[in-house]
Design a protein with these regions (language model features):
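Active-site nucleophile/metal-coordination loop of metallo-enzymes that catalyze phosphate/sulfate
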Residues: 4-164, 170-181, 188-190, 194, ...
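Terminal, contiguous helix-loop blocks that mediate binding/assembly
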Residues: 162, 177, 185, 189-225
């Protein structure tokens, strides 16, 4: 039963509020135990919430399976990310005269589809490998994190990009989209096209800072997604 969990009874616990005679009988008459479904018990960083994919994978494997989030975190920490041959091939191409490295993806620490620390590690590794121009195309989250948290993530990102620029690498935000458009999974081209045009054609152009763009969106009651 996907989504079933054990927690203290209360008004917000749908399971404890429901009438569950079959489950009550199973718990009363059959052996059972509890499994942790988040954090290090399922191969995620400590304190990181689990999700359905993580639960299915660990139960099916019968052991702790280190998730991509944990593996990439470790690669960032031990330096092996910067030594990845595929990444280094891209960094080498970006180091050529007149070239630029374009990074695109979800900008949040939701931990389901993204970790902004991975973005920072990639940008720093590219700069260390000789890239002189880095452009970040930001897909705002608002689903795995609060719906109006994006402005804070962009402010933090701009701080990292400013550090790289101070070190001699032009690092900047190229476009801002919402995941509703940029990460549509249902083949809705009318959505994806808007994010694609923002990345490829810089349409529509905005003569404003990232903070101004986000503030205008919030003022119009448009959230990050």
């Amino acid at each position: 039963m996907d989504g079933f969990g054990l927690a203290e009874p209360g008004p917000g616990n749908a399971i404890s509020q429901a009438r569950t005679p079959c489950l009550d009988e199973v718990f009363a008459t059959r052996p059972w135990t509890k499994l942790e479904a988040s954090g290090e018990a399922v191969g995620l960083p400590a304190g990181q919430m689990g999700n359905s994919e993580v639960g299915h994978l660990n139960i099916g494997a019968g052991r702790v399976v280190f998730q991509e989030l944990t593996r990439i975190n470790r690669a960032c920490a031990d330096g092996s990310l910067a030594a990845n041959p595929v990444l280094n091939e891209a960094f080498a191409a970006a180091a050529r005269p007149g070239a630029a490295l374009h990074l695109m993806g979800l900008v949040s620490d939701g931990g389901v589809h993204s970790s902004n620390e991975h973005l920072y590690a990639l940008a720093r590794a590219a700069k260390a490998a000789g890239a002189s121009h880095i452009v970040v195309h930001c897909f705002m989250d608002g689903r795995d994190v609060p719906p109006r948290s994006g402005a804070g993530y962009l402010d933090e990102l701009e701080g990292v990009l400013a550090e790289l620029t101070d070190e001699g690498c032009t690092a900047e935000i190229g476009s801002i989209s919402g995941r509703y458009y940029a990460m549509d999974r249902d083949n809705r081209w009318e959505r994806v096209e808007q994010a694609w045009r923002a990345v490829v054609a810089a349409e529509p152009r905005a003569d404003a800072t990232a903070a101004e763009v986000m503030a205008a969106s919030y003022a119009a009651d448009v959230t990050d997604e």
